[in-house]
């Protein structure tokens, strides 16, 4: 008699995805971040669900309802800070996951990569709308500044902004619809994750060498389930240290002041995980140009498969491109720092230089490095 998990219509999907999945025997801990992102998503959906039970999406009571959650609801403070800091952990895992994909040439699995880009954009949209919900100063002004960017779209821009606002400024209708979208998007993300996995399992995972590993595959369970479990334990430990010891380390003090449309904060800035894109946006003096650069900072990832010039898949045996890659990582850290600084000398000029470097590295330097390495290999 065959085991139920191999025959049952529902269980066999799980069996082929998480138990008997043939997996390369040499994948490193960099391949853990997919499962960690799944864990982050589950934590966010669960904590978000419990927060939604006590939150009110009305401008007069939103701020008070968040204070009520922290003060009066049993373990409300824990749920709230797990949700807020869980978003930070989510983005840390996302950036490392994308960074791994670039380093090991995973972008050559085009469908998986493109669904991943859509996922990244959707998670960013969800996080942005979530930041608006507590209705603090930075929530309100962040929403005003970012939604206002759509007014840069020629002809329909102003109408579009008012349509999104539901009025002539960010107000009650904006908050209500942002809450509705923030609630539904994680479920859309979950569906996209399944599509992402569907495409991944069509080709199978890559491995650090970039070579075909069909001859050396092992079952996912128990080898990688136990490895993912260790990763999950480390992630949850890091999250709980953040939540229990430094809950406000990554937040903005301005968000503990209720939203006031008559008082603009000195420095309007988004959460830390958007600072690199915000720096690119601010580094271009033209409004429409800034919006396009902001979009391109993420969408440029879709060009990675086209810009791949090397005969090798990964960067493991390519020291020149490795150097360029780590310069790109340093550049992104500089952009993140600049995004949190005021627009004045010397920050403005550093931001412009770092923005030019960001696009130049991806579009020009990495493809050239690949060609040079091909030529060096041909000489041998």
UniProtKB/Swiss-Prot annotation:
Topological category with respect to the lipid bilayer: Multi-pass membrane protein
SUPFAM superfamilies: a domain/subunit of cytochrome bc1 complex (Ubiquinol-cytochrome c reductase), Transmembrane di-heme cytochromes
One Gene Ontology term of the molecular function aspect: metal ion binding
Highest taxon of the lineage: Eukaryota
Listed transmembrane segments: 33-53, 77-98, 113-133, 178-198, 226-246, 288-308, 320-340, 347-367
Locations listed in the record: Mitochondrion inner membrane
GO CC terms, sorted: mitochondrial inner membrane; respiratory chain complex III
Cofactor: how bound: Binds 2 heme b groups non-covalently.
Key words, A-Z: Electron transport, Heme, Iron, Membrane, Metal-binding, Mitochondrion, Mitochondrion inner membrane, Respiratory chain, Transmembrane, Transmembrane helix, Transport, Ubiquinone
Binding site for heme b b562: 83, 182
Cofactor needs: heme b
A single GO BP: mitochondrial electron transport, ubiquinol to cytochrome c
Gene3D superfamilies assigned to the protein according to its UniProt record, in alphabetical order: Cytochrome Bc1 Complex, Chain C
Binding residues annotated for heme b b566, in chain numbering: 97, 196
Family: Belongs to the cytochrome b family.
Subunit structure: The cytochrome bc1 complex contains 11 subunits: 3 respiratory subunits (MT-CYB, CYC1 and UQCRFS1), 2 core proteins (UQCRC1 and UQCRC2) and 6 low-molecular weight proteins (UQCRH/QCR6, UQCRB/QCR7, UQCRQ/QCR8, UQCR10/QCR9, UQCR11/QCR10 and a cleavage product of UQCRFS1). This cytochrome bc1 complex then forms a dimer.
Name the UniProt record assigns to this protein: Cytochrome b
Gene: MT-CYB
């Amino acid at each position: 008699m065959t085991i139920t998990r191999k025959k049952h219509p529902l269980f066999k999907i799980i069996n082929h995805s998480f138990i008997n999945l043939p997996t390369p025997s040499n994948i490193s801990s960099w391949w853990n971040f997919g499962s960690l992102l799944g864990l982050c998503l589950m934590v966010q959906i669960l904590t978000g669900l419990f927060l939604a039970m006590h939150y009110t999406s009305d401008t007069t009571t939103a701020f008070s309802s968040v204070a009520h959650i922290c003060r009066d609801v049993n373990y409300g403070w824990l749920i709230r800070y797990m949700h807020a800091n869980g978003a930070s952990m989510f983005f840390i895992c996302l950036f490392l996951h994308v960074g791994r994909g670039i380093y090991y040439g995973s972008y050559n699995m085009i469908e998986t990569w493109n669904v991943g880009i859509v996922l990244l954009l959707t998670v960013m949209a969800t996080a942005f709308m979530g930041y608006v919900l507590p209705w603090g100063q930075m929530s309100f002004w962040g929403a005003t500044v970012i939604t206002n960017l759509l007014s840069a779209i020629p002809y329909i821009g102003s109408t579009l902004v008012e349509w999104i606002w539901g009025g002539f400024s960010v107000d009650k209708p904006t908050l209500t619809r942002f809450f509705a979208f923030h609630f539904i998007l994680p479920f859309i993300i979950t569906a996209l994750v399944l599509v992402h996995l569907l495409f991944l399992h069509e080709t199978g995972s890559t491995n650090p060498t970039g070579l075909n590993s069909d001859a050396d595959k092992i079952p996912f369970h128990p080898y990688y389930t136990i490895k993912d479990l260790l990763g999950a334990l480390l992630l949850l430990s890091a999250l709980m240290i953040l939540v229990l010891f430094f809950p406000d380390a990554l937040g903005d003090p301005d968000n503990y002041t209720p939203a006031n449309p008559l008082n603009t904060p000195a420095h309007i800035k988004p959460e830390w995980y958007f600072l690199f894109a915000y720096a690119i946006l601010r580094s271009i003096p033209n409004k429409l140009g800034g919006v396009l650069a902001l979009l391109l900072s993420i969408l440029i990832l879709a060009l990675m498969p086209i810009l791949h010039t090397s005969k090798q898949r990964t960067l493991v045996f390519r020291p020149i491109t490795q150097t360029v890659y780590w310069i790109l990582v340093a550049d992104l850290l500089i952009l993140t720092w600049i995004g949190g600084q005021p627009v004045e000398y010397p920050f403005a000029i550093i931001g412009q230089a770092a923005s030019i470097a960001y696009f130049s590295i991806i579009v020009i330097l990495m493809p050239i490095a690949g060609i040079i390495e091909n030529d060096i290999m041909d000489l041998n």
